[in-house]
Swiss-Prot record:
UniProt cross-references to PANTHER family, sorted A to Z: OS03G0406300 PROTEIN, PROTEIN DEEPER ROOTING 1
Keyword Isomerase: no
Sequence similarity: Belongs to the LAZY family.
Ranges spanned by the short sequence motif IGT motif, renumbered to the chain: 46-52
Gene that this sequence comes from: DRO1
One Gene Ontology term from the biological process aspect of the record: regulation of growth
Disulfide bonds, paired cysteine numbers: none
Biotechnology: Introducing DRO1 into a shallow-rooting rice cultivar enables the resulting line to avoid drought by increasing deep rooting, and to maintain high yield performance under drought conditions.
Induction: Negatively regulated by auxin.
Coiled-coil boundaries: 64-105
Species, as recorded: Oryza sativa subsp. japonica
UniProt keyword Coiled coil present: yes
Function text: Involved in the control of root growth angle. Involved in cell elongation in the root tip that causes asymmetric root growth and downward bending of the root in response to gravity.
Full protein name: Protein DEEPER ROOTING 1
Record's keyword terms, sorted: Coiled coil, Growth regulation
Length: 251
């Protein structure tokens, strides 16, 4: 209602100003301004928020209200008892301990992961080195076998061609010089001499049988050989000494 009355007064004031002359306008304006101040002083601060008037006052009022709310909240926090404060402090301590444990566990896990990665890397390096060494050994062995095969084949073929062309084919092995005189004949001769010395009066049949079955000792053989050599020396025969045996030559 005051707003409507203010608007009506403003309109009536303008009309009155138009009625009065210019000389009498000054005192009237002073009266109008005083009336406006009185009207504005009676209005509440909430109505001034509609227009542009009273912004600074509204901000000051808001700051005062916020400060009062903060003071009230501080007073409310001060109302905690000692038991509640201890309980809150314990909860904070447990939270901090849990946080420290989690950080320690995380750092331990990171260390374990790093060690595992290092061990895996070392194992992989060892495995790679072993594979490289095996490949090097296999390649070297293949190269050596290939070289040996290439060098042996021409030599064998060349040697076979030389033997075939020079000697007219493959011949048997040449016997050694001491195999020219058969060993069986020498054995027969020695056994006959020994048989004559041991059994001089037996017949030829008994001599043949005992010659096949008799096996003298080394001492008997040596004695018989010495006696045979003496008899041969007395008869005028000669013994020719070779590398392995004694050969009897009749004069």
């Amino acid at each position: 209602m005051k707003i409507f009355s203010w608007v009506a007064n403003k309109i009536s004031g303008k009309q009155e100003a138009n009625r009065f002359p210019a000389n009498s306008s000054a005192p009237y304006r002073a009266n109008v301004s005083d009336c406006r101040k009185d009207e504005f002083s009676d209005w509440p601060q909430s109505l001034l928020a509609i227009g542009t008037f009273g912004n600074k006052q509204i901000e000051e009022v808001a700051q005062v209200e916020n400060s009062s709310d903060n003071v009230q909240s501080v007073q409310d926090t001060v109302k905690f008892t000692e038991e509640e404060v201890d309980k809150i402090r314990k909860e904070f301590e447990t939270l901090l301990a849990i946080k420290d444990q989690a950080e320690a566990q995380r750092s331990h896990d990171d260390d374990q992961v790093g060690l595992q990665k290092r061990a895996d890397g070392e194992d992989n390096e060892k495995h790679i080195r072993q594979l490289i060494n095996k490949r090097i050994i296999v390649s070297k062995s293949k190269n050596s076998l290939g070289k040996k095969g290439n060098t042996l084949k021409p030599r064998s073929v060349a040697s076979l061609l030389k033997l075939f062309m020079c000697k007219g084919g493959f011949t048997s092995v040449v016997p050694e010089p001491r195999n020219t005189f058969p060993q069986s004949r020498m054995e027969k001769l020695l056994k006959a001499i020994l048989q004559k010395k041991i059994h001089p009066q037996n017949s030829s049949t008994l001599v043949a049988k005992r010659h096949l079955d008799w096996k003298p000792d080394e001492t008997e053989i040596n004695e018989c050989l010495e006696d045979a050599l003496r008899d041969l020396d007395d008869d005028g025969a000669k013994w020719v000494k070779t590398d392995s045996e004694y050969i009897v030559l009749e004069m």
